[in-house]
Amino acid sequence: MSESKLDVTLWPSVNQLTNPLVKHLVDNAKALRLLVEKLPSGATIIDAGIKAEGGLEAGRLIAEICMGGLGHVNLHSSSTFPHWPWTLSVHSNNPVLSCLGSQYAGWSLSHEKFFSLGSGPGRALAGREELYKELGYKDSADAAVLVLESDKVPPQEVIEKVARDTGVNPENLTFILTPTRSLAGTVQIVARVLEVALHKIHTLHFPLEHVVDGAASAPLPPPAPDFLIGMGRTNDAILFGGHAHIFVKGSDEAAAKLAKELPSSASRDYGRPFAEVFKAVNMDFYKIDPMLFSPAAVTVTAVESGKSFIGGKLDATLLDQSFGYSA
């Protein structure tokens, strides 16, 4: 593995940055329709969609926590997709740290029948993933927060593991639970539209140190009570409706190549709603082409020349099919 060329000396603590955001959730739990519980271990559970109603605003705030306090998530109207007027727009001025170092759901947590992928700042304290060796970044903080796309409270064994791996006492740990079928869960997944672009940039071996800035948007899908359909819709919002604008250093040739390879349509599995693709491989994620997970359209701007390169396309027809619209 090559040594990181990223300059992380001025990178802040994502856990320290999110402490005030987590406090805001707790202090405004009733207004946000959240349930807050202290477990016997001392850990705090924020329910954003299991017993609690949650909602769009809760999901928006949770998405900003996922981004380590380095991202802004906005919900606004848009005419891009006439049947789906609400859009999530995401921006980070440090997309590598915010999206890969914090937001990416890369920490596998399991015990007996419980399984969830942890995302958010707590990952950067544990540093359990190979990704952190590549980034050359490890956080330092006295409190940590993780977001779990789960409809179950993590068992004591998982909480103990997180405390052990992060070096944080359980009473300073917060777990935010956002089931995929919930409104908050839907928002925080679609708000990963910039993150999936960064993850694919990393997969394509484009130099992360050349990524200067980034912004992206994707339509807000209707939630679904069925897990598979709900998961499919949140993925398809990005695969068919996501548009990322990435600002990079380096040659025009490298920027043009990235614009061509980055969109979801560059994948062999593109062309059907995600739920259908998932069923076709017997619900085995590892059989899906990893190049599929990216925004539908991309704009890559080479900041040193000022030239921009366009790749992919938005697909309203496939989006309507996935979201359950019938004329």
From Swiss-Prot:
SUPFAM superfamilies to which the protein is assigned, alphabetical: Methenyltetrahydromethanopterin cyclohydrolase (SSF56199)
Reaction equation(s) it catalyzes: 5,10-methenyl-5,6,7,8-tetrahydromethanopterin + H2O = N(5)-formyl-5,6,7,8-tetrahydromethanopterin + H(+)
GO terms under biological process: formaldehyde catabolic process; one-carbon metabolic process
EC number(s) reported in the record: 3.5.4.27
Pathway in which this enzyme or protein is active: One-carbon metabolism; formaldehyde degradation; formate from formaldehyde (H(4)MPT route): step 3/5
GO molecular function list: methenyltetrahydromethanopterin cyclohydrolase activity
Subcellular location as annotated: Cytoplasm
Listed GO CC annotations: cytoplasm
Primary localisation category: cytoplasm
Keywords tagged on the record: Cytoplasm, Hydrolase, One-carbon metabolism
Signal peptide: none
Cross-referenced Pfam families: MCH
Organism domain of life: Bacteria
Described function: Catalyzes the hydrolysis of methenyl-H(4)MPT(+) to 5-formyl-H(4)MPT.
HAMAP family with a match to the protein in the record: McH (MF_00486)
Family affiliation: Belongs to the MCH family.
Protein name: Methenyltetrahydromethanopterin cyclohydrolase
Organism from which the protein derives: Methylobacillus flagellatus (strain ATCC 51484 / DSM 6875 / VKM B-1610 / KT)
Lineage of the species this protein comes from: Bacteria, Pseudomonadati, Pseudomonadota, Betaproteobacteria, Nitrosomonadales
Gene name in the database record: mch
